């Protein structure tokens, strides 16, 4: 009897979850300085969209269709399914038809009968899909199964126009269009959300500090041991098995506010565009930098050498080349101990360095060991 009494009075962790839901609802909205909701920094494992794709035909074009051989083959196959046979060797002259690829993202928990938006893109040499209609196209997933069926009239933002002399103009991209609510979901994607007694939260930006804070925040409100940080990206949380309780539990859980850990110090450089992004935590050790510009200008002109009227010789064109080298005075700026982002920006602006010069300075500081940040060149 004593053992039965102990088991009856013992509270299972999942029972603590159910009893704490009301208290959690009162506490989870407490304001925290610099805090973010869990739903903004993490996703639930297994809750994701899936890509689906298909191949079909767009008809009704105003003479802007393609002339690809696979378009002709696809059209013949479609007509055969309708019981119409096109004689071999006959050119159907498909100026109003274009072969297209159709793709879409199938949102998580999509149910049969729901509508989703689709994107239609020409795969041949069609000039424009404007005014066309997509015929019924099966959209399949990576497993080869059909999850949606697409059909409808295209909305094309781009257009093109041309003249009889061959001149033409194109605005945006007329070979790609959209069909809002253009596909109907026919099959639901299996989800692991309602299985098991745990949920896993995956951080969008893996960070050990953030994972630890999410774990502690959940355990402080629901009870010790319910949340466990698995690694820098994942936090495993015990959750009710019943679907309705699991949904309610997660709706409260995702609105908890947590202060994320500070991002690692990074400097991102786009060498093609000259864009430089400096993170907030970037610091520079004491260092002095001098950077001078050497400008070499080569100009080439042509002069005329014409002899006197009584002298022999021919008038010739003589090239005249001028090489000029200018070196601007080198300017030096110095960083004090633990210089911050503001110090770097202010010093660079005072020197008046171009983006290319800034890249060279940052790379030199990194090589010298004075730049305490990860330098990423994209």
UniProtKB/Swiss-Prot annotation:
Taxonomic source organism: Hahella chejuensis (strain KCTC 2396)
GO MF term list: structural molecule activity
Family according to the record: Belongs to the FlgI family.
Key words, A-Z: Bacterial flagellum, Periplasm, Signal
GO CC annotations on file: bacterial-type flagellum basal body, distal rod, P ring; outer membrane-bounded periplasmic space
Subcellular location: Periplasm; Bacterial flagellum basal body
Purpose of the protein: Assembles around the rod to form the L-ring and probably protects the motor/basal body from shearing forces during rotation.
Quaternary structure annotation from Swiss-Prot or TrEMBL: The basal body constitutes a major portion of the flagellar organelle and consists of four rings (L,P,S, and M) mounted on a central rod.
UniProt xrefs under InterPro entries: Flag_FlgI (IPR001782)
Signal peptide: 1-33
HAMAP family: FlgI (MF_00416)
Protein name from the UniProt record: Flagellar P-ring protein 2
Gene Ontology biological-process entries: bacterial-type flagellum-dependent cell motility
Top-rank taxon, per record: Bacteria
């Amino acid at each position: 009897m004593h053992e039965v009494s102990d088991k009856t009075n013992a509270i299972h962790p999942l029972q603590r979850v159910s009893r704490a839901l009301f208290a959690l609802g009162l506490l989870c909205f407490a304001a925290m300085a610099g805090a973010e909701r869990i739903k903004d920094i993490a996703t639930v494992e297994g809750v994701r969209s899936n890509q689906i794709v298909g191949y079909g035909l767009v008809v009704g074009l105003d003479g802007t269709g393609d002339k690809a051989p696979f378009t002709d083959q696809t059209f013949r196959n479609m007509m055969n399914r309708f019981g119409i046979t096109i004689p071999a060797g006959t050119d159907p002259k498909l100026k109003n038809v274009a072969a297209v690829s159709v793709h879409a993202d199938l949102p998580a928990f999509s149910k049969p009968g729901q509508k989703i938006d689709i994107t239609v893109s020409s795969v041949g040499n069609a000039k424009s899909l404007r005014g066309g209609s997509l015929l019924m196209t099966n959209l399949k997933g990576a497993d080869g199964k059909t999850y949606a069926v697409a059909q409808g009239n295209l909305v094309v933002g781009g257009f093109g126009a041309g003249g009889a002399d061959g001149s033409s103009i194109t605005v945006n991209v007329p070979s790609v269009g959209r069909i809002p609510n253009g596909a109907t979901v026919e099959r639901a994607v299996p989800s692991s959300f309602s299985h098991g007694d745990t949920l896993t939260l995956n951080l969008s930006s893996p960070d050990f500090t953030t994972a630890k804070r999410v774990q502690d925040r959940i355990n402080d409100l629901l009870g010790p041991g319910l949340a466990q940080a698995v690694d820098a990206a994942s936090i495993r949380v015990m959750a009710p098995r019943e679907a309705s309780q699991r949904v309610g539990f997660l709706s409260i859980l995702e609105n908890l506010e947590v202060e994320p850990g500070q991002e690692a110090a990074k400097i991102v450089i786009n060498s093609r565009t000259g864009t430089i992004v400096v993170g907030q935590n970037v610091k520079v050790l004491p260092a002095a930098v001098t950077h001078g510009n050497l400008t070499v200008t080569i100009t080439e002109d042509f002069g005329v050498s014409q002899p006197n009227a009584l002298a022999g010789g021919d008038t010739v064109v003589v090239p005249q080349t001028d090489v000029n080298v200018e070196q601007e005075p080198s300017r030096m700026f110095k960083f004090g101990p633990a210089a911050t982002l503001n110090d770097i920006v202010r010093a660079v602006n005072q020197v008046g360095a171009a983006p290319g010069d800034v890249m060279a300075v940052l790379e030199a500081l990194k090589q010298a060991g004075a730049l305490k940040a990860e330098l990423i060149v994209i």
